Amino acid sequence: MTYAPVHPSIAHLNADALDALVAAYVSGTSASAIIQRFKINIAPSRLRSIMPLRFANQVCEACGKGMVQGLPQRGASADVQGVIRCPACRHELTTACRCPHCRRQIARRLEAERAIRLAKIKEAIVAERDRYPTWGGTVDDMPLLVAVSYLALCRCCQPDELQLCMPLESSDIPFAPTTLLQDEMVQHLRKLGLISISDHSSPDASQLDARGFVFNPDKVRWQLRAESGLTLTSAIESAGRTGSWPARWGEEAAGVWMLVAMAECRQYFDHCARQRGFHCESDHAISVMLTNLLQDMSVAQCYRAIWFGARAAADFLVRSRCSRPHAANYMIGACQRWADHARADCWNVVPFKRNFDLPRSMISYVLFDVILKIGECGFTEPVGKMLRASA
């Protein structure tokens, strides 16, 4: 067996002795016994560092120098081979090699994979956009909810002269009270052909996986699709400023108000539950309860009912030592019972103020300030009365 130049401590050994030294070391013979047997002047702890390396009869692909093969781990079976490496550039014939050559190869491979992934994502963005025809109508053709959502998105995302918008997450004001309402409104605007995902979006904002094309509505950049997209924004603002609404908007106002009120109440309900470590899974039961409260209470008054319901659920958790899911369900009923008690005894329910941790959404600003011009009355006045008046 041919060895690379050996350490001075074992230079006195011939080829056969080196073979015997390697065999003894690999077989697991103690370092002290090996040192004594082969008369090596070295500390036992340094024995591995001076063991001879064999020429591997291979040329390094990185630098062209001859490679050597190290020893396998002590006690390894006979078919286990040592790692082949280059003594000049430290390249190893392993998947774990991180020499400069391998790092460059990995970087090139990752860059190629990234380019392929980005190309596929752009294809998916184009295909997604082409699923829905471009909006060709005017403001008069828009339902009130669509007009409010469109203007709110434009105010959050600040489209430029090319109608390219910033991501929703860049806005200091949230688009909608809840993620659910935001996603529903964004999806609705996409299906109407008013907006589409821009191929200028960050690569991290979307991906292709087993579910197909998946994107984060908060992180992608949006493109206004209508040729007069910015003109539509101005037309909606003008309709709100002058009060010259499409006839249908007046009929739809109470329903849109109710939708925003429900979202704001649900946002506060989830906030109170989260503060107490509750996770309510019964979306239907929560929606039924909030709908009942909003029949004669404002959002601000519902905040008070929800707060007392959350406090009662926390007390119930301590008193009964029940599970948190049980207490979370109790919270729903506690909110309803508090509201029923308030109605039965004709309480003057003092409204809460907005929660500092739950800032007013852009949809609320557009609906109540720009279109309806009632400001925070959308928060402090009962929507149920308007619903009954419009029925």
Which residues are covered by each model-predicted region?
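Basic, amphipathic alpha-helix used for nucleic-acid engagement in HTH/winged-helix/SANT-Myb modules
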Residues: 1-15, 54, 116-136, 236-247, ...
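Short, amphipathic alpha-helical "recognition" segments used to contact nucleic acids or chromatin
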Residues: 9-29
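Short, solvent-exposed alpha-helical "recognition" segments
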Residues: 15, 43-61
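Basic, alpha-helical nucleic-acid-binding regions used in initiation and control of genome expression
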Residues: 29, 74, 78-81, 133-391
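Short, basic interhelical loop/turn and adjoining N-cap
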Residues: 32-49, 177-181
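Cys/His-enriched microdomains
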Residues: 55-61, 65, 84-87, 97
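Cys/His-rich microdomains that often coordinate metals
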Residues: 64-68, 93, 106
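Cysteine-rich micro-motifs
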Residues: 73-101
